[in-house]
Regions:
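Short Gly/Pro-enriched turn/cap motifs at secondary-structure boundaries
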Residues: 33, 92-94, 138-142
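Active-site loop ensemble at the mouth of alpha/beta enzyme cores that anchors a bound cofactor
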Residues: 59-136
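C-terminal accessory subdomain/extension
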Residues: 108-207
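Active-site loop/helix belt of alpha/beta enzymes
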Residues: 1-91
Length: 207
């Protein structure tokens, strides 16, 4: 169908279903998709359309680079999180975002509370983040809007943060976490050297 103000210039083939942890299984699934996408491009070319293809999210884009000359479109581009770092070991992601918070109380001998509630970190994943330096040593008790209560696992009680101590939480899902803040502080060699404004959090419909 002809539309006077619309031109077909490309295909955006996002395949979020292929976020498979095993790299060989991921590559196998994406190989099938690339074949389909190439066939579609060939059919469109017969009809007179020269199109580009944009494909591949954060877990998938390295596979597309091996299999095609498509443009790739990783969504988690600047700051990696604990979710992708754990799920895709083959990609050797380094966590590059954390939330600075503080231990505000010791409800009992095992538990401690951080001032990092659901207002401070994305609440969509079941495990919303990990405490840097205490990975695997704590259990989550509860989280509400302002606070997050943890329990030290048996044998690690001596590592419980002191009241007033600064603690760093690495989010499981950085994308909606970053949208909760107007800017991010940039740290290099343990020193704050600048800040980045989070422009994408300011959304507005203009039509």
């Amino acid at each position: 169908k002809e539309l006077s103000n619309v031109n077909l210039v490309g295909l955006h083939c996002y395949d979020g279903q292929n976020g498979i942890s095993d790299v060989n299984e991921r590559l196998k699934a994406i190989t099938k998709l690339v074949d389909i996408e190439k066939d579609l491009v060939a059919e469109l070319k017969k009809l007179g359309y020269e199109v580009m293809v944009i494909s591949g999210g954060t877990p998938e884009f390295p596979c597309y680079r091996k299999l095609s000359n498509f443009y790739v479109s990783p969504g988690t581009l600047f700051l990696q999180d604990d979710g992708y770092s754990n799920a895709f070991k083959d990609m050797d992601y380094e966590c590059a975002c954390c939330i600075m918070c503080r231990c505000v109380s010791h409800p009992n001998a095992e538990n401690f509370t951080l001032d990092c509630g659901t207002k401070a970190i994305a609440s969509d994943p079941a495990v919303r983040g990990v405490i840097a330096g205490l990975e695997g040593k704590t259990e989550i008790v509860l989280q509400n809007e302002e606070h997050w209560v943890f329990r030290m696992k048996a044998g690690y009680e001596n590592l419980k943060p002191k009241v007033g101590e600064v603690v760093y939480v690495i989010p499981t899902h950085v994308c909606p976490t970053s949208a909760l803040y107007p800017y991010a502080l940039v740290v290099r060699d343990h020193k704050v050297v600048g800040s980045w404004q989070i422009f994408a959090r300011n959304r507005k419909i203009i039509f």
